[in-house]
Amino acid sequence: FLYSQELMPRRWLLLGATTLVLILVLGEAHRAPANFTFVRMFQGKAIYLSAILPAIFYLTARYLSPRGTSADAFLLACAQITAIGLSNFSILAAPMAGAGALLSNYILLNQQSKRKFWYVVATLSIALPYLIAVMLSSQGGASLSQFETELPATVWKSVLGWRQHYFVAVLLLAGPILAADKLLRLRLAIPMLLLLAIYLNPLLSPLISRFVTTPPVYWRVMWSFPLLVAAAAGFCLVIEYVREKATRRIFPMMLGTVVLFLLAVSIPFHTLRQDNDIRWDFAAKKISPDDYEVAQTAISAMEGNTGRLLAPDEISGIVAMFETHPVLVNARSLYIGFLAPAMGEEDSAARQLLHGFVSGTAESGPAVRAALNSLSVATVVTHGSSQQPELELLLTDERFRRTHAVHGYDIWHRNLPSSR
């Protein structure tokens, strides 16, 4: 609401309320800002998107305005610092957002406000020491080039929704076009221009993905400005335009009809729909209850015993979340390649082989037997091993016995004299 007050001072309450409505409507995609803003509020990145991102735009606009004070500058610096602790990517996203906010308010700058300009620029470099430290510490680590870069068009649709992105696009375009105030027009247009012309530019996206964001999280360039507030501003301006011009021209009627049609198409895929896996709870677990029970059972099977626990990713990832848990062969198979330089070729190859073994992508054989023993595996979680006779035979030969069958998983255990 504070950012709404800065964008549209005379209609800030309507803009804030419209933003809340769009949060409830635009939740089709798992990556959607609406999902992060409301449904996943217990995550740090959700707090960044819902609070810190609009705060950066609000505080930048307020500080650069004639009524800006040193208190606004201090809070802007605090927002950049807070972003560092909320999410790994917000270390990049917050300076990107700050740059967009600074450029969208450039007409407020004059000879007397040069000091303000350089102060805002300074806040953009707050995360720089941390970024340099991360870069230096990752030297010699596994390359992320194995991941393919998502196409910008795919990023756009996967974040805004495969059906809802048309509605959002119309609102984001309508805002700058219909805004009568020059400052409002710039505040809506420039962050969007940066997103489309630079961050989602098909010519630049491979470079940005590889050297700035890394391919797995390239889609988070969409976190560079508050999309929902900008879309809400566009909606408010469309309604105002239609109300003023509809009786005299056909275009306002057509625009209003298109917006209402796209809204009607979007509503069935709202944020609170049942297939979005919504549960009303405080900091609810973002995991399958069945998988959680399997993880608990696997941990209890090893209680008081030595050795490592081997499980598929969906189970081992949950086991790793427990404050006290057995030593895992892998928390997530994705990390094997990342940590290979630190583990050594033989160790990482054994872990990769065992991951394939419990995931059903690698055949049983002498190499698997050797890996089970070299890594001192005491407990194994498998998908219904009764349908995999070779797997069952191998585990039995290696002195494992099936102790539990839970939700389609079998838990095998053997006693080891000591841990590796």
Model-derived features: positions:
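Transmembrane catalytic cores of multi-pass membrane glycosyltransferases
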Residues: 31, 44, 89-193, 200-203
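Hydrophobic/aromatic-rich transmembrane helices and adjacent perimembrane loops
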Residues: 39, 43-52, 210-243
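Membrane-interface transmembrane helices that cradle and orient dolichyl/undecaprenyl
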Residues: 53-74
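Membrane-interface alpha helices of multi-pass inner-membrane proteins
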Residues: 72-89, 99-100, 125
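Signature aromatic-anchored transmembrane alpha helix within multi-pass, membrane-resident enzymes
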Residues: 100, 121-128, 238-271
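Short periplasmic/luminal acceptor-recognition loop of GT-C membrane glycosyltransferases, typified by
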Residues: 292, 296-352, 369-388, 412
